[in-house]
């Protein structure tokens, strides 16, 4: 299967890996839709699929989170979002928590970082570098800074942005290509290497 809207080999490789493993769906049978904005619901759905869709329920959802648009019969990401709240990947104090919020760099790094920690991966970063980066970027939480540093040191985000660019563009929305690339590198570099150890 080759999606007709993907021209770059880099995007093709990550998309095909994620698609063939059942982690992500295309926009149509022959187009991926990579330039569309990545959404929180889809992002956590990919993580949920990587985790083999564990059983979940809505007990951890914040009050009034369920709506006509977001419920078990109306939203394809319902189970994934419920699971993300139960697992602590999404938290009520986070900046972007609605299933239809656009993903940005800081949210992507934060969710990947939390997922890696939940999966037993070593998420330590250099503490002095973290303190310095927090001082230089006071608009970012300490956890977001550590998440961005960890995603950079593990090469999850470096093909897209160097660390300085990542910090400067922390609130820039990412598209489905970027989402797929980040999660592809999480799978192939971190999760697979841990499973092989």
Locations of regions flagged by a protein language model:
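Non-catalytic cell-wall polysaccharide-engagement segments
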Residues: 176-178, 183
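Alpha-helix C-terminal capping/helix-coil junction sites
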Residues: 19, 85-86, 152
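Phosphate/pyrophosphate-binding loop motifs in nucleotide- or prenyl diphosphate-using proteins
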Residues: 22
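Feature responds to low-complexity, polar/acidic, surface-exposed segments characteristic
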Residues: 1-12, 25-44, 49-78, 86-105, ...
């Amino acid at each position: 299967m080759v999606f007709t809207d993907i021209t770059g080999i880099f995007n093709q490789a990550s998309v095909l890996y994620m698609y063939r493993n059942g982690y992500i769906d295309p926009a149509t049978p022959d187009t991926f839709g990579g330039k569309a904005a990545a959404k929180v619901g889809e992002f956590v759905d990919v993580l949920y699929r990587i985790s083999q869709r564990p059983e979940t329920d809505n007990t951890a959802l914040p009050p009034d989170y369920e709506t006509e648009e977001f419920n078990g019969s109306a939203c394809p990401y319902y189970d994934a979002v419920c699971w993300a709240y139960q697992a602590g990947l999404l938290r009520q104090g986070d900046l972007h928590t609605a299933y239809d919020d656009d993903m940005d760099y800081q949210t992507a790094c934060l969710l990947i970082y939390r997922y890696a920690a939940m999966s037993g991966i070593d998420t330590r970063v250099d503490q002095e570098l973290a303190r310095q980066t927090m001082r230089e970027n006071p608009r970012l939480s300490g956890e977001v800074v550590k998440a961005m540093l960890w995603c950079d040191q593990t090469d999850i985000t470096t093909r897209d942005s160097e660390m300085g660019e990542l910090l400067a563009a922390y609130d820039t929305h990412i598209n489905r290509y970027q989402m797929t690339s980040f999660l592809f590198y999480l799978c192939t570099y971190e999760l697979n290497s841990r499973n092989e150890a």
